[in-house]
């Protein structure tokens, strides 16, 4: 029960992050290698793609977990799917923390 609440909470956090990035129109930068982006894609678009990808991985892990509970999926697939989703979520959280840290540092700069 706790895990399902956490997955819903994680999906909500990802969707809010994606919406915030899309609304703010964060400046352009080169995309990380993990997320292929079109040439000239903005930083906000790259983050939106990344959050969408992580959200899909979380949903796939949840579906695989349910199949595992029913006995339709092998334990190895369940563990692999959940670990992949967890790693992706941790990456997004680390990026979010760095963005917040950079924003706070910029906001403290004298004008």
Swiss-Prot record:
Name by which UniProt lists this protein: Flagellar hook-basal body complex protein FliE
UniProt main location, coarse: other
Signal peptide: none
Matches recorded under Pfam families: FliE (PF02049)
Family note: Belongs to the FliE family.
Keywords for the protein's UniProt record, in alphabetical order: Bacterial flagellum
HAMAP family assigned: FliE (MF_00724)
GO CC terms, sorted: bacterial-type flagellum basal body
GO biological process: bacterial-type flagellum-dependent cell motility
Organism: Brucella ovis (strain ATCC 25840 / 63/290 / NCTC 10512)
InterPro entries per record: FliE
GO molecular function: cytoskeletal motor activity; structural molecule activity
Location(s) in or outside the cell: Bacterial flagellum basal body
Record's keyword annotation contains Transferase: no
Annotated PANTHER family: FLAGELLAR HOOK-BASAL BODY COMPLEX PROTEIN FLIE, PTHR34653
């Amino acid at each position: 029960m706790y895990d399902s609440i956490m997955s819903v909470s994680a999906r909500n956090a990802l969707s809010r992050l994606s919406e915030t990035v899309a609304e703010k129109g964060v400046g352009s930068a080169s995309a990380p290698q993990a997320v292929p982006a079109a040439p000239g894609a903005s930083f906000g678009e790259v983050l939106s793609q990344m959050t969408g990808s992580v959200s899909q991985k979380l949903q796939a892990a949840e579906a695989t977990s349910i199949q595992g509970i029913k006995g339709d999926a092998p334990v190895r697939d369940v563990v692999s799917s959940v670990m992949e989703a967890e790693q992706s979520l941790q990456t997004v959280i680390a990026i979010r923390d760095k963005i917040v840290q950079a924003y706070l540092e910029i906001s403290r700069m004298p004008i």
